[in-house]
């Protein structure tokens, strides 16, 4: 786990319903976020990563959606249409936002998050966990352990409530 300087992109992308959404402002806002990177034709590691994300999501089911967002970002946007993302999410029983978009926009977004690889097949599993309201992010390399994701998210929630009675807003 390495602490990371992450700037979430706010370019227009599409979620799995085909709706145009901006990642930083519309999806994440000032919530705590867990981001992973997938592509739908990936048969090896992505279904595993997504299943682990789903387990983490279950463990955090008591946390309000106002406080927590899970996001899966496509690293193969030319192939990953919203319809394919919907299918991929359904197979994985993943109940969160999947994002794709124009290749150039997605590539820039991935570069911004340090998650770009020229060949999706080669991408090493990596997730980003952080609090968008404080900019406190970590990168986790390798397959994410659901318990670790849960611990990290709860730690961020705790830091928020310490910060000021449960509402952390930047002034």
Please annotate each region the language model reported.
Residues 6-8, 28-32, 65-68, 80, ...:
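Extracytoplasmic
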Residues 122-171:
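Thiol-/selenol-based redox modules, centered on thioredoxin-like
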Residues 1-25, 51:
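N-terminal "domain-start" segment that seeds a small globular fold
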Residues 48-94, 103-112:
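Structural microenvironment flanking redox-active thiols in thiol-disulfide oxidoreductases
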Residues 9, 95-96, 107, 113-127:
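Structural micro-motif
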Residues 38, 46, 57-64, 110-113, ...:
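Sec/Tat-exported extracytoplasmic proteins
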Residues 14, 97-101:
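Short acidic-hydrophobic, aromatic-tinged amphipathic segments that line or gate anion-handling sites
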Residues 23-53:
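Short active-site neighborhood of thiol/selenol oxidoreductases, capturing the structured segment around
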């Amino acid at each position: 786990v390495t602490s990371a300087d992450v700037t979430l992109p706010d370019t227009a992308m599409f979620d799995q319903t085909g709706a145009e959404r901006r990642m930083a402002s519309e999806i994440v806002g000032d919530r705590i976020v867990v981001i992973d990177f997938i592509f739908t034709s990936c048969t090896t590691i992505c279904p595993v990563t997504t299943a682990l994300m789903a387990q983490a999501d279950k463990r955090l089911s008591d946390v309000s959606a106002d406080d927590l967002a899970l996001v899966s970002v496509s690293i193969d946007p030319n192939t990953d249409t919203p319809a394919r993302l919907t299918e991929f999410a359904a197979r994985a029983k993943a109940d969160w936002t999947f994002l794709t978009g124009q290749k150039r926009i997605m590539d820039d977004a991935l570069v911004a998050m340090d998650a770009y690889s020229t060949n999706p097949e080669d991408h090493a599993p990596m997730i980003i966990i952080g609090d968008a309201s404080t900019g406190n992010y970590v990168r986790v390399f390798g397959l994410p352990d659901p318990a670790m994701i849960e611990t990290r998210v709860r730690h961020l929630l705790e830091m928020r409530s310490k910060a000021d009675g449960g509402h952390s807003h930047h002034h």
